[in-house]
Amino acid sequence: MKDDFAEEEEVQSFGYKRFGIQEGTQCTKCKNNWALKFSIILLYVLCALLTITVAILGYKVVEKMDTVTDGMETSRQTYDNKLIAVESDLKKLGDQTGKKALSTNSELSTFRSDILDLRQQLQEITEKTSKNKDMLEKLQANGDSLVDRQSQLKETLQNNSFLITTVNKTLQAYNGYVTNLQQDTSVLQGNLQSQMYSQNVVIMNLNNLNLTQVQQRNLITNLQRSVDDTSLAIQQIKNDFQNLQQVFLQAKKDTDWLKEKVQSLQTLAANNSALAKANNDTLEDMNNQLSSFTGQMDNITTISQANEQSMKDLQDLHKDTENRTAVKFSQLEERFQVFETDIVNIINNISYTAHHLRTLTSNLNDVRTTCTDTLTRHTDDLTSLNNTLVNIRLDSISLRMQQDMMRSRLDTEVANLSVVMEEMKLVDSKHGQLIKNFTILQGPPGPRGPKGDRGSQGPPGPTGNKGQKGEKGEPGPPGPAGERGTIGPVGPPGERGSKGSKGSQGPKGSRGSPGKPGPQGPSGDPGPPGPPGKDGLPGPQGPPGFQGLQGTVGEPGVPGPRGLPGLPGVPGMPGPKGPPGPPGPSGAMEPLALQNEPTPASEVNGCPPHWKNFTDKCYYFSVEKEIFEDAKLFCEDKSSHLVFINSREEQQWIKKQTMGRESHWIGLTDSEQESEWKWLDGTPVDYKNWKAGQPDNWGSGHGPGEDCAGLIYAGQWNDFQCDEINNFICEKEREAVPSSIL
């Protein structure tokens, strides 16, 4: 500004020779005084405006020439023409001051408007450049973020590849596990077959033991019968002995009577004495026979005692074998249950791993698709950014070239203006010398001229003092959401909020994969003893019995007269060994009779063929599979019904019968009223053996829920949809068995 004021002071000493003011007489000076003043003021104003505009243009153009657009070329040409016209007008102002005052004013106004337009264009260019800078910064930030994202994507892809390799390794390991499990299952099947074979052998041994026990019981009954027969024979012998004693007494009486009549019966005395001797011999024989019978009785008692002891030993052995077999069966059942739980766990683990692998593959496919989409988008963005960067580089190169051209032209224009200013200073000095010779007389005031045009808006004044703080305005509308910033550090845990209101019940989800089975529960109490089994196969032939004691040999009697034929004598001593005789008859007949006895038919237990008996009921375990209604009709055709399980013992027996088989229908349903389970005859359920989490009435999103119950692999109850196909169990009352069959 100081330079501008100095230039104005220098301009005030202008000369006016070039503008048509010539020296003359004093009168002409007076006449032309007003015109000279007006022309001088006009020249000062024009020069000041020109210097100000040139200085402002130079300052603005030098400051903001980096962001000049293509439209500056046309404006520059017009400005060059206008500057040339201004120079020519300045050169011709001395001759054409009066004529072209209005034209200069109009040109100045147009020049001002052009300068304002140029300022606006420069402001727009600066705004565009600032926007372009912001866009460049944003593009650079986006490029950096894209680079970071690409690195993150590479890391995620590496992690995914590592996960895929680990999944493949785990799959290989699971394949090894599956092969090992298959081998284990084959080994288990072999063990099961061996256990079944050993179980069959044990059953055969038990049947043989039962047969031997039955034979021993029959032998004991026969021995008891023989003992009873011997006791009867002894009673008969005692009765005979008493009769003989009575006879002997009668004989004594007769002898007394005969002694009285000895004289008359002397002929008969010899006979009577012979008869007495014979009677004495018979009595001695009877005494000997009684002693032999007592020895035989002693032998029989010893044999019976030995048999009783052997029976007791056999019963103890039988009880021990039964206990051992029961313990073995319980151990086998526990092992079977453990094997079943292990197999179920393995199946559940395999299903869980398969489900997990499916989810992993789906997630990997989703990640792959998202990665491909993001990569394609990023490649498109990068191509667009590269194109925009190329365009920006070309624009910047063209702007720099235009800036260089404008600088060179400004330098030339400033040089021309400096030359013009030097010439004007010289003219001003000359005019000052000429003005010293002028005598200016003040003439009468002229008429008031017309109102001039409104001047241009002045520069803004200095900023005033800061005013008082105004009232707080209304909150403005929320601005657009900014870009998402980086994730900040994790803040401290907030206070626990109040308990929210209970939400509405959501829809029932899909049926999940079977959970892992729980630990094995404690063994239950031993059940009551079962009913007696069927008669087994006949056992082997028993050993021969003990040999009886040999009787005592009687003394030879005195030969008497030949009497009546007496009783058979006691067997004598064994004679010498003779030649071998023909083969004798076979051994004891009772075991043979037992061996040849036919096995009882299946109707002996009161159940038809292919039906099994338990307590007073008969059960049919189907081989075919039907839906619930068809199974119910099948049982009704057999004059029975689907099984009703009303006790723990019945449940355990049915569990043993269905071990290792598929699911079976039972006569339990809630089709009449949901969640109210009843047997088919309408009776409520007293005993329950539902699986954990059942019944769940799972509908799987189609049709009705699960309204029919059945047994699963572990013997527990589960609800099924009634249109599923399963095996079934029929139940009916056992028919009365005739006593003749028993």
Swiss-Prot record:
GO terms for molecular function: carbohydrate binding; low-density lipoprotein particle binding; metal ion binding; pattern recognition receptor activity; scavenger receptor activity; signaling receptor activity. Ca(2+) 2 binds at residues 670, 674, 697, 706-707. Ca(2+) 1 binds at residues 644, 646, 650, 731. Residues 1-37 are cytoplasmic. Residues 614-731 form the C-type lectin domain. The keyword Iron does not apply. Residues 452-511, 527-586 form the Collagen-like domain. One of its GO terms (biological process) is plasma membrane raft organization. It is found in: Membrane. Glycans are attached at residues 159, 168, 271. This is Collectin-12. It comes from Rattus norvegicus. The gene is Colec12.
